[in-house]
Amino acid sequence: TPWKMMGRMHDKYLIADGSIYILGGRNTYNYFLGDFEKYKNYDRDVLVICENPQKENSVSQLLDYFENIWKQDDCAYFHEDKKLADKASVKKAALRMEEEYKEYAAEYKECIFDSDYTDETFETEKITLVSNPIHTGAKEPVVWYTLGELMKNAKERVKIHTPYIICNEMMYNTWADVAKNVSEFSVMTNSAANNGNPFGSADYALNRDKIVDTGIDIWEYEGGFSYHGKSILIDDNLSVIGSFNMDMRSAYLDTELMLVIRSSEINKQLEEGLMTYEKMS
């Protein structure tokens, strides 16, 4: 229907064994996943391990979120015909995937191994999942409201990374309020020339002065390949990572997920990651 046709499921996450998950802004498409020479995107995800998944925590939040998406009327099986597996084209595709995996495993042996990821992660004080409504119609901008309040309550700094900036007056006003309260307030986004989204780059070029007028400092990324990370650094103990772009589609139309992580170690690690890109801006 016309009032639903623009709704999109924009979340990106993978849950394993009900106790570990990856969540971020990375699409499952070739140039989001690989290191290709001609075209690729730079992205960011976060790995979360829950040692006690029976308790109320972010993994239980995410599992409940998945179940609610799965059960709603707008979701349906693409097909349930097991006979498709007997088609020659399907068998050929399955064989090709098996062969490509063997080639990958042989070329990248260092990536195929069992690992205790708890040795490579940091213990956090708290992780909270923030989400938009999941229906396909126009949405209350829950994620935007939540992020806005987190940023307004920062004591010293807020650093945003987003591939796109397409705001309305309410969103500009939120940033203006943050700028009044926070001395170090900046955003890094793709320059118009470096942006892989022509609509996003056109709106940014047209409204850049409006963004500057909010009081935020802008860094334009010029790394040659489009930057696709969506993150917010707040003071020295809060990190926000997920799928939400600083645009009206993420605010009002799409399903979106952002993780709010309270941890000084994660904050420091995220800052180091953000700065590698800001050096090219």
Question: Whereabouts are the PLM-identified features?
Answer:
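Charged, low-complexity intrinsically disordered terminal segments
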Residues: 1-12, 16-281
